[in-house]
């Protein structure tokens, strides 16, 4: 981290301390009391065993059960703990603008945390390989034609950490550090007097009042307090447990021992003051320009306090035991924007044109955009890729992108702007009901086309409209190959494709007719962008033997939420 980033981050911390000083409490006595309780009641042979499990190359459900059992014992022995609390934030102490900011920032934070804790794309090996092994694996995969694969980022010690468990939700809230537990472990496992440990961590906390203690500071303090030599200077990896001796854990413990220091670690949140605390946090956000960072990894001070306060809302968010809490911050905090409609009087679907007035986002949210980017990593930039659209180049209503080599496809819809022209196209081409498009996700066309790999080559049956669409979205770098099949040839396998893959699309509900050269009309099969791609591929191969199609986008991305109420 650069010095400017460190200074800015600490500026945020200092500003938050000043603004939230009225919510700080004296926790020194209770932290020491809880540490004594842990020293007398905790089985430190099991603590040592848990520390061993955290060093294993593979951790499974049995390891998680042992960790959760020990965490429950710790929870039963301490008094500083946070309680399960569902928070509903409404207009009051917080204005409607405040609520919108909180909703947006929690949404961004959710996306960041999810990106930090999961691989960038499906199918990535998440075992405990060293970075050297992962680099060799990448070379080998490229050798066998799987060059699109990506490797997850490594942890601070060169090991990719992973829990191989059936229910990942059981991992939530099981890894935070607690000052009382840090004190107890340093005392027992370092064979030091509790009073010496308290003095050492208090001095570390005093340094923290002026700066973030670093390894150089730790080394100097170790000359006076040898127990600090147990502190591990390596950066903590994700999901490694609260029983480690990290510098962050020691600094947090030191801060909790400073009565009167206005340390964020001593803040106590209750259902009565949570709105006021968040109001103060937003005041600091505006004054010093705090924000939720796009970069996955450690949380900055604003992200940290926002997450911790919204996780429980009842207790000491930084230092209390929270292993009994289920869910994440966005699960336990609801932002009520006051835009709910009575579901009993539910009318026809709301058009995207009026969705903004009903409280809907005009485009993709931050978390949706992050999900879209992650999902589109499944697209192989070098593979043969079909593209087809329904509607006009300047007003498309259905777009499909399909890769026959792996079966991956992107398929979504768009509400038209020219309803009169749409009805003509529906009658003679696609047969889509405009009301079925009112719940489609606005902004998805631009987002998908923007995130297609650079200089990609797309194959199509008819190039003019697709070229215009791509150019309108600034994607002149994408090249097009027009197969230019005769109409009858292109639709050679139409009935077989519809028989086999009709379940992939249910939007083409209308009757479509075709004008005959000698007059009159004939009913024909509607044109579906996705199924057209499948039949074009079947025609070029003269075979129906194709890879099972697999959607890249989730349904939640293709269709917007049915209610404007934001649940975080």
Curated annotation (Swiss-Prot):
Binding site for Mn(2+): 388, 390, 532
Binding site for the cap structure m7GTP: region residues: 54-240
Intracellular or extracellular location(s): Virion; Host cytoplasm
Domain of life: Viruses
One cellular-component annotation, GO: viral nucleocapsid
Record Pfam families: Arena_ncap_C, Arena_nucleocap
Site (Important for exonuclease activity): 465
Gene3D superfamilies cross-referenced by the UniProt entry: Arenaviral nucleoprotein, C-terminal domain (3.30.420.410), Arenavirus nucleocapsid protein, head domain (1.10.150.550)
GO BP terms, alphabetized: negative stranded viral RNA replication; RNA-templated viral transcription; symbiont-mediated suppression of host cytoplasmic pattern recognition receptor signaling pathway via inhibition of IKBKE activity
Entry keyword Transferase: no
Binding site for Zn(2+): 398, 505, 508, 528
Gene Ontology molecular function terms on file: hydrolase activity; metal ion binding; RNA binding
EC number of this enzyme: 3.1.13.-
Keywords: Capsid protein, Helical capsid protein, Host cytoplasm, Host-virus interaction, Hydrolase, Inhibition of host IKBKE by virus, Inhibition of host innate immune response by virus, Inhibition of host RLR pathway by virus, Interferon antiviral system evasion, Manganese, Metal-binding, Ribonucleoprotein, RNA-binding, Viral immunoevasion, Viral nucleoprotein, Virion, Zinc
Domain commentary: The N-terminal region is important for the cap-binding activity while the C-terminal region contains the 3'-5' exoribonuclease activity. A CCHE zinc binding site is present in the C-terminal region and may thus contribute to the substrate binding and/or the specificity of the exonuclease activity.
Protein family per UniProt: Belongs to the arenaviridae nucleocapsid protein family.
Quaternary context: Homomultimerizes to form the nucleocapsid. Binds to viral genomic RNA. Interacts with glycoprotein G2. Interacts with protein Z; this interaction probably directs the encapsidated genome to budding sites. Interacts with protein L; this interaction does not interfere with Z-L interaction. Interacts with host IKBKE (via Protein kinase domain); the interaction inhibits IKBKE kinase activity.
Name of this chain's protein: Nucleoprotein
Record organism: Mobala mammarenavirus (isolate Rat/Central African Republic/Acar 3080/1983)
Lineage: Viruses, Riboviria, Orthornavirae, Negarnaviricota, Polyploviricotina
Gene that this polypeptide is encoded by: N
């Amino acid at each position: 981290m650069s010095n400017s980033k460190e200074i800015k981050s600490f500026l945020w911390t200092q500003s938050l301390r000043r603004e939230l000083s009225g919510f700080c409490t004296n926790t020194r006595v209770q932290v020491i009391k809880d540490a004594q309780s842990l020293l007398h009641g905790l089985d430190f042979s099991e603590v040592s065993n848990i520390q061993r499990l955290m060093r294993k190359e593979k951790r499974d459900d049995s390891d998680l059960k042992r960790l959760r059992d020990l965490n429950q014992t710790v929870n039963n022995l301490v008094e500083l703990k946070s309680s399960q609390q569902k928070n509903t934030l409404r207009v009051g102490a917080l204005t409607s603008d405040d609520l919108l900011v909180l909703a947006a920032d929690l949404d961004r934070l959710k996306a960041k945390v999810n990106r930090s804790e999961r691989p960038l794309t499906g199918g990535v090996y998440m075992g405990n390989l060293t970075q050297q092994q992962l680099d060799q694996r990448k070379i080998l995969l490229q050798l066998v034609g799987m060059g699109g694969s990506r490797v997850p980022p490594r942890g601070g010690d060169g090991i990719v950490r992973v829990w191989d468990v059936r229910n990942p939700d059981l991992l939530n809230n099981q890894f935070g550090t607690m000052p009382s537990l840090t004190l107890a472990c340093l005392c027992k496992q370092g064979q030091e007097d509790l009073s010496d440990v308290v003095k050492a961590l208090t001095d570390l906390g005093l340094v923290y009042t002026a700066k973030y203690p670093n390894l150089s500071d730790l080394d100097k303090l170790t000359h006076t307090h040898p127990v600090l030599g147990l502190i591990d200077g390596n950066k903590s990896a994700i999901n490694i447990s609260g029983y480690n001796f990290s510098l962050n854990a020691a600094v947090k413990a030191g801060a909790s021992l400073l009565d009167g220091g206005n340390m964020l670690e001593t803040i106590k949140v209750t259902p009565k003051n949570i709105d006021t605390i968040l109001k103060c946090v937003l005041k600091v956000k505006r004054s010093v320009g705090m924000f939720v960072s796009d970069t996955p990894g450690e949380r900055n001070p604003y992200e940290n306090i926002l997450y911790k306060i919204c996780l429980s809302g009842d207790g000491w968010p930084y230092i209390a035991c929270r292993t009994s809490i289920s869910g994440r911050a966005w699960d336990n905090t609801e932002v009520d924007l006051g835009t709910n409609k009575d579901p009993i009087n539910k009318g026809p679907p709301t058009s995207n044109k009026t969705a903004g007035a009903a409280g809907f986002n005009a485009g993709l949210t931050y978390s949706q955009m992050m999900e879209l980017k992650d999902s589109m990593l499944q697209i192989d930039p070098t593979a043969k890729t079909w593209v087809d659209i329904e509607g006009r180049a300047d007003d498309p209503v259905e777009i499909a992108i399909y890769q026959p080599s792996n079966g991956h496809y992107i398929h979504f819809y768009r509400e038209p702007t020219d309803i009169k022209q749409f009805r003509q196209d529906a009658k003679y081409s696609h047969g889509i009901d405009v009301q079925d498009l009112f719940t489609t996700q606005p902004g998805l066309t631009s987002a998908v086309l923007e995130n297609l790999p650079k200089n990609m080559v797309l194959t199509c049956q008819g190039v003019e409209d697709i070229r215009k669409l791509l150019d309108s979205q600034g994607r002149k770098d994408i090249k097009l190959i027009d197969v230019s099949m005769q109409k009858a040839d292109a639709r050679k396998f139409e009935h077989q494709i519809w028989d086999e893959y009709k379940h992939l699309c249910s939007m083409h509900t209308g009757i479509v007719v075709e004008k005959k050269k000698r007059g009159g009309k004939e009913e024909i099969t509607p044109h579906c962008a996705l199924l057209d791609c499948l039949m074009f591929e079947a025609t070029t191969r003269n075979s129906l033997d194709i890879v099972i199609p697999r959607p890249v986008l989730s349904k939640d991305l293709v269709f917007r939420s049915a209610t404007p109420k934001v649940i975080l």
